[in-house]
A protein has these predicted regions:
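Short alpha-helix at the nucleotide-sugar/activated-sugar donor binding site of glycosyltransferases
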Residues: 31, 71, 94
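Glycine-rich beta-alpha loop segments
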Residues: 1-38
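Short glycine/serine/threonine-rich phosphate/pyrophosphate-binding segments
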Residues: 22-25, 67, 85-90
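C-terminal amphipathic helix plus adjacent low-complexity
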Residues: 145-169
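Short, acidic/small-residue loops that bind anionic groups at enzyme active sites
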Residues: 41-42, 87, 95-116
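Structural motif
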Residues: 17-18, 40, 80, 103
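Short acidic-hydrophobic, aromatic-tinged amphipathic segments that line or gate anion-handling sites
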Residues: 56-61, 128-140
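Glycine-rich oxoanion-binding loops at beta->alpha junctions
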Residues: 40-77, 81
Length: 169
């Protein structure tokens, strides 16, 4: 909930897998704070979209490929809890040099990343992109936004017709 709320309060756009659990709670937080929420859904149906999604996008793809589209469309990734799907998204973000921020204390995969990370902050010895670890939602969102502002994502990969559009996280 708090991650979505903080993202909205910063004027950024929340993008999730659009269904239940952490995705729904963060979407609710964003909506209640006046934010905009995009849900990237596996398959062709809107049936699984949670009630807080403003823009549901059916990808026509199975879950794992839907996650790749979501990660590729994001400027940064905040990892909360998670299991095997989150592991795939983490790997995809790392391979695509997306800023990765882990919300410590959120359980699941998030509680294990630092232990298996190379030098405590990389997936492997290639050191594609450093993983940041934050203790609370506000710090995680601020870190994500700051990492985006430092030009981690190559400028030519961003296409915005309207400069007033919110930042994507």
């Amino acid at each position: 909930y708090e991650i979505g709320k903080e993202i909205a309060l910063k004027g950024a756009l929340l993008m999730t897998g659009g269904t239940s659990g952490v995705m729904e709670y963060s979407s609710k937080g964003a909506k209640e704070a006046g934010g905009l929420v995009v849900g990237f859904l596996a398959g062709d149906s809107l049936d699984r979209a949670n009630d807080y999604i403003d823009i549901p996008i059916t990808t026509g793809l199975p879950f794992d490929f839907r996650s790749s589209v979501l990660i590729h469309s994001s400027d940064a990734v905040i990892v909360i809890g998670g299991c095997n799907g989150t592991l795939g998204e983490l790997s995809c973000a790392y391979l695509n040099n997306k800023p990765i921020i882990v919300l410590e204390g959120s359980g699941g995969l998030s509680s294990k990343i630092k232990a298996f990370a190379y030098e405590g902050c990389y997936i492997d010895e290639r050191k594609n992109i450093k993983i940041d670890f934050c203790q609370d939602a506000k710090a995680a969102v601020e870190t994500a936004i700051n990492r985006c502002k430092k030009g981690v994502r190559k400028k030519e990969t961003i296409s915005r017709k309207n400069p007033e559009q919110p930042d994507l996280i």
